[in-house]
Structures are given as structure tokens and as C-alpha cells.
Amino acid sequence: MPISKIHARYVYDSRGNPTVEVDVVTELGLHRAIVPSGASTGQHEACELRDGDKTKWGGKGVLKAVQNVNEVIGPALIKENIDVKDQSKVDKFLIDLDGTPNKTKLGANAILGVSLAVAKAGAAEKGVPLYAHISDLAGTKKPYVLPVPFMNVLNGGSHAGGRLAFQEFMIVPSAAPTFSEALRQGAEVYQILKSLAKKKYGQSAGNVGDEGGVAPDIQNPEEALDLITEAIEKAGYTGQVKIAMDVASSEFYKEDVKKYDLDFKNPESDPSKWLTYEELANLYSELCKKYPIVSIEDPFAEDDWEAWSYFYKTQDIQIVADDLTVTNPLRIKKAIELKAANALLLKVNQIGTLTESIQAAKDSYADGWGVMVSHRSGETEDVTIADIVVGIRSGQIKTGAPARSERLAKLNQILRIEEELADNAIFAGEKFRKAVEL
């Protein structure tokens, strides 16, 4: 069934910045996708095309990307008349049309919008839900696997004020029997955490960050972990709800001296207190002994390969590569060869097409890695990643706290999928790292 129209416009993301929305129209109707954007962006990821016109949106406009869809990609793709069900052919056409290694010419935000909208058109043409179409494209086995939600309940780093260097503290309800129960446990812990934060740090500590987590004025990781552990205990889930961290350590790496500054938000930070990677690795090991931590993302800077390999040898927890790999096949290959991590953070907008995202997941699975599908800090009401996480059978999703509609939209979509699949789906639970093998 041919595409009759492709139209892009700009809409706003959850931070009030413009982003790209794409409509693909076929005989079966309109299929729409909106592209997210990140705050801490890795330097090796696909190019998010921004206008750079400081007089509008502080330079963050996407009029050029929108124009590229409407004047270049749209007409060319319609003329090519590719079957919308043939996602890899569509995506290859988009990649070739751009012709640059990281989509700088047309913009990954323009290309991804079209890629995801086409996937929705393909699902409609097959008369199946999007997750089922993605499952076919990825060639994953059945039953479907519903993911463990990694919920970012406490923020630090560049996502929050306060002196806390680590960016995200997540709760992981992996001992729950079903996805809906996991979400309930997470929501209950979150509510308790919020009231504890207000009690200990004042009313404003209940204010939420970009991803819905609270951001009290916390000084160090132990303080954050104690607060979360207390919330888990008060909710009655000790031993059931685990903890994960996204350190986002590239944000506080001092490249010139190869050290990590845990007081990086303080302009008067004392260089004698900066840590070598061995000292930072030691801190993580101590935290893992003291708290129920099951996963650490970006423990070291994106080009500090030596540190990653060193830490990997000492740990059996999940070590998630995000800034290190930025969903880029070449970086993933290097990380696997150097034994730097054991899980991939999959962000579709870091690579720019659905086909490449599926391939990145498959490459990771092939080497025994886990895959965590992720939102970005600038999100929208688009729920495509919920269908992706079920379709590629990855068993883990990170999409913020159970707060703010752009975060809940994804979790609510998984609730709907759970209801629809009933006995045809299993919950990843404690086996989230190897969900693809379940």
C-alpha cells in the first residue's frame, strides 16, 4: 500500500523545546511519530539537527529538520514507492538519502520521525499491533516478554540542583510476579519516597526533575541510597525492590587529569579530592555491598575504556553502556571486544532508524549482553518505545518515574499490551538481563 503523504511539523517536548513530529498517510489512515531529545548527549551519537538561530528557541529550533522531511525525504520516499511493511528497505533508503555516517545532512531527528511513522503504517497494513510488527522485524521468539520498569525516582547530576554528582537513582521491582504488579510496587515506593524527601529536606524537595524523580538537596550517593532504601522498607518491599544507578560520569570527568570530580557542581571544587578510576570503582563496589544495587549505567566516562574494562572484571552486576556506546554499532563492537560492559542502553534517537536500533539490540544479544530500552529526558506523548521493548524482547525499560504524563504514557502503554496479550506474555522479572533467552 503506497504512502500518499508525508508531512512533518514541529511540536514541543516535555522541556518546552521544539522537536519533530511526522505524519505518514496511507489508505489505512494517518500514522504519527514524535522524536525525543536528550539533555546529556554523547559525543558519538547521531546528529540531532537544530537550527542554531539564537533569536528563536535559544537556537534549538527544528525548522530545518522539518523542512528536510517535507521537501527532501517525503517526496523522495513517496516516489520510491517502497512497501511500508519493508522497514529495512525504507530505513536503508533514508540512510542512503542522507549519505553521512551520523545523519548530519538531513538530521537523525528528521530521519527517525519518518522511520517510526512508517513502522506504524506497516503494522496497520498487517493489521497487527506495533509491538507484533516489531517482533516480526526483529525475528524474536514467542511468548512476548514484558519488561521490568527501571524507575528514576531520585535525580542528581546535570538533571538537578544540589551537589549530588550521580544523575539517576532508580528502583527496580524485579521480584514482582507481573508487569502491573511491578508498576504498582514502584508507584507505592515513589509516593513514600516523595513524602520522606519533603519531611527531611523541606517542601521543595518534593518538586520533580525532568524525568519525574525528586531532587532533594542531597550531598552524596549514600544519602540518596539511604533515603530510597528507607522508602522501599516503609512500602514493605525490602528484598523485592532493588536499586539501579545511572552515574552519567562523563559529566564530571576531568579529561586533562583523568580524574572524576564528585563535587563538579561546585566551582570551588578541591582537586585533591578528585578520584582516579580505581578509587571510583572501589566506591561503586562498596555501595554494591551495602545496598541492593543490580545495575550501574555509565560508571565511567565515554572514552575512559581502561576504567570500564577494569570495573567489568570485578563485578557481577549489570554494567550498562550508554555514553560509551551511544547505540552505535562500531562502539558496541569495541565495548564487546574490550569486555567493557554487559548491557546496552538502547535509545532509538541516538542511531536514527528503527532497523539500526533492532540491529544494535541483536548484536548485543549475540554476545550475551542485556538490552535496556530507554526514553530521553526531553520526551513527548509518543509511546513507540513501549512497543519496541516488547517487540525486541529486551525485558527492561527505563522511562522515568511513575510521574509526569510523558513518562507514564510509556508505562501505561505496556499495561495495555499486558492486558491484550494476557497468557501470551511473560514478565521478565529477576531474569531481566537474559530476557531474550526466556
From Swiss-Prot:
**Which NCBIfam families does the record match to this protein?**
eno (TIGR01060)
Q: Which family does it belong to?
A: Belongs to the enolase family.
Per the UniProt entry, the Enzyme Commission number(s) are 4.2.1.11
* SMART domains for this protein: Enolase_C, Enolase_N
Q: Does the keyword Metal-binding apply?
A: yes
List positions binding Mg(2+): D246, E297, D322
Q: What is this protein called?
A: Enolase
Q: Which major enzyme category is it?
A: lyase
Keyword field: Cytoplasm, Glycolysis, Lyase, Magnesium, Metal-binding
- One cellular-component annotation, GO: phosphopyruvate hydratase complex
Cofactor or coenzyme needed: Mg(2+)
* Assembly notes: Homodimer.
Organism classification: Eukaryota, Fungi, Dikarya, Ascomycota, Pezizomycotina
Please give the pathway this protein is involved in.
Carbohydrate degradation; glycolysis; pyruvate from D-glyceraldehyde 3-phosphate: step 4/5
Active site positions, chain numbering: E211, K347
Report the cofactor remark.
Mg(2+) is required for catalysis and for stabilizing the dimer.
Q: Where does substrate bind?
A: H159, E168, E297, D322, S374, H375, R376, S377, K398
